[in-house]
Amino acid sequence: MDKKRDYISPSDLTFLWNECKKCLWLKYNHKISTPGFMPLVGPMSAFQESMYREKATSYLSSELAPGVVSDWGKKVISKPIVIDGVETNWRIEGKYDLVITFDDGSLGLIDCKVTTSEMDADKVSHYRPQLEAYAYALENSLNEESKKVSETGLMMWRVNGAEGEPEDSFSFKTSHQYLSAGRDPAAFLGLVKEVINCVEGEMPESGDDCKNCKYVEKRTNII
């Protein structure tokens, strides 16, 4: 018998939770995941991440406190999540992009993103649950020494053009910006409480704008 899922993926707090709670419930209870088609996301993120390894924080942004990018691309697993003083059956598990060690010993958690849209506060609001999930795992690590996370944020690259010659090579041009998300652990725990109640409860209704559920419904009606 397959082991029952006992972890929450940080990205699900940003995407699935907001898009369709029914799809989230199916994924966590029956291991049914909607097919994804974003072949460039992984490679682009890896290229972006590689540019900041072992760099001083001033290389990323003048807004960051003194420190250095000390870790990247590592899997992190939290201890069981505690909600309202009660230990749940769930933990956080995922792979972060960049971790900064600041001069004061605290950590910064940075997620790398490539976009074609505006780099603004809406991006911070959208990705904050994901950032807080990684921060929670670092502060409540199952296998590593737990450390305080004093900052989270997004390193955004916006693709805005291309250049090059046929006899040489082509490359995309980007502008870049660091967007600080700060910390909001209380809001994160409140959200996780809702997520756990959802996946441990009855199957919810489809999201109003869930393209996957609409596709399944239309297909089922035909065949």
Regions found by a protein language model. Give the residues of each.
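Active-site-adjacent bridging/hinge elements
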Residues: 103-111, 187-189
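Short alpha-helix boundary/capping segments
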Residues: 122-129, 180
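Short beta-strand-loop-alpha-helix junction that forms the active-site gateway
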Residues: 112-122
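Acidic active-site catalytic centers that drive phospho-/nucleotidyl reactions
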Residues: 97, 111, 130
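Metal-dependent nuclease catalytic cores that hydrolyze phosphodiester bonds in DNA/RNA
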Residues: 1-106, 116
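Alpha-helical scaffold elements adjacent to nucleotide-binding pockets in ATP/GTP-utilizing enzyme cores
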Residues: 51, 130-133, 191
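Metal-dependent nuclease catalytic regions and adjoining charged, substrate-binding loops involved
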Residues: 2-10, 140-223
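An active-site-proximal "capping" alpha-helix that borders the catalytic cofactor pocket
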Residues: 127-139
